[in-house]
Regions:
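Substrate-binding/active-site clefts of carbohydrate-active enzymes
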Residues: 1-63, 84, 88, 93, ...
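Short, surface-exposed alpha-helical recognition segments that flank or form part
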Residues: 43-47, 185, 240
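Active-site-proximal helices and loops of the catalytic beta/alpha 8
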Residues: 54-173, 186-189, 195-200, 212-318
Length: 319
């Protein structure tokens, strides 16, 4: 469809059949596998995208890979993405049938495909990446390189995300805060950022080091838009991990893992933010098979007991 930053361009948009590339003919001949590979893939029997999607799906059928994160998805047309998705769905079923004793063989979820397209966000809606490209989720650039709002104003984002994402089970957004392409979302209270991100509706991802307070590369210039010299892409801070911050992110992350309502449920504010009691909200989820409800408070003062009214979900005596 187009070339990315001068990198070689596979003509996936062309539908005519092509022969096996000379470089592979040479490689397979030298390996002594040419006849075997031609018998498997054919010679002059498919388009560029036919070959590429077949080869990529072999990672799935051979190793049981159950998902791809596809970078710069806009550089490949939707039909080729859909072709890849369909082949990978079939390949994963084959792997599970052929490897019944291996981990993941008894899972029933189809192959998952997440796409990345710069500036794509919740406002992009349930667009052609989903309907034509076969993507299950798209990365959400809404918060790229930016901290999430304070507890006093985060209800609007929670409500918007829940209303937009969780009203359509085929529309998924993968949200993050820090990025190697924009900035590290650092504030004086990264524990709160962990709470806000882990309690966000939809899917979330942790960019390495957000949970441990990783810094940029010392002494390396940063231009504010991706970083000159890749200062944002510093090594993981294994020797200087903020253990208190990590423990908090792990605690809230575990809560999210244990409660599907956090990411997939409907959102309701219980009490607006107050400096003395924080901000309290509920999430409810029921798909007819699984039912889950939670109430959470964030932004409350440290080391202070607060009373939370849970009667909207649980009556007295509920265990």
């Amino acid at each position: 469809l187009m070339s990315l930053a001068g990198l070689p361009d596979f003509k996936t948009e062309q539908t005519k059949t092509v022969s096996i590339p000379p470089i592979l003919k040479t490689k397979w001949t030298q390996e002594g596998t040419y006849d075997q590979k031609v018998a498997k893939y054919g010679d002059n029997s498919g388009s560029v995208s036919d070959y590429l999607t077949t080869w990529l799906s072999e990672w799935v059928s051979k190793y049981g890979v159950d998902g791809f994160r596809c970078d710069t998805a806009k550089h490949v047309e939707m039909a080729s993405w859909k072709k890849l998705k369909d082949k990978c769905v079939s390949a994963l079923k084959t792997w599970r049938q052929n490897n019944p004793t291996k981990a993941g063989a008894d899972w029933d979820e189809d192959f998952w495909m997440t796409g990345e397209c710069w500036d794509h966000n919740i406002g992009s809606g349930y667009d052609s990446y989903f309907t034509e490209g076969g993507f299950d989720s798209m990365i959400n650039f809404d918060t790229s390189g930016s901290p999430l709002p304070a507890a006093s104003s985060i209800n609007g984002k929670f409500q918007h995300y829940a209303d937009s994402i969780n009203s359509n089970d085929k529309f998924n957004q993968l949200t993050y805060i820090s990025s190697h392409d924009s900035n590290l979302a650092r504030t004086s209270d990264m524990a709160y950022q962990g709470s806000a991100l882990m309690l966000l509706p939809g899917a979330v991802q942790v960019f390495y080091g957000d949970e441990t307070n990783r810094k940029t590369v010392p002494g390396m210039s940063f231009d504010g838009h991706g970083g000159s010299g890749h200062s944002l892409r510093s090594d993981m801070n294994w020797d200087s991990i903020d253990q208190d911050e990590l423990a908090h992110w792990q605690k809230v992350g575990t809560f999210r893992k244990n409660h599907v309502a956090v990411g997939a449920g409907q959102h309701q504010q219980i009490t607006a933010y107050n400096g003395s009691t924080g901000y309290t909200f509920a999430r409810t989820y029921d798909d007819g098979t699984v039912s889950d409800n939670i109430i959470a408070t964030i932004g409350a003062p440290n080391n202070k007991d607060i009373a939370v009214d849970v009667s909207s979900l649980w009556s007295d005596g509920t265990e």
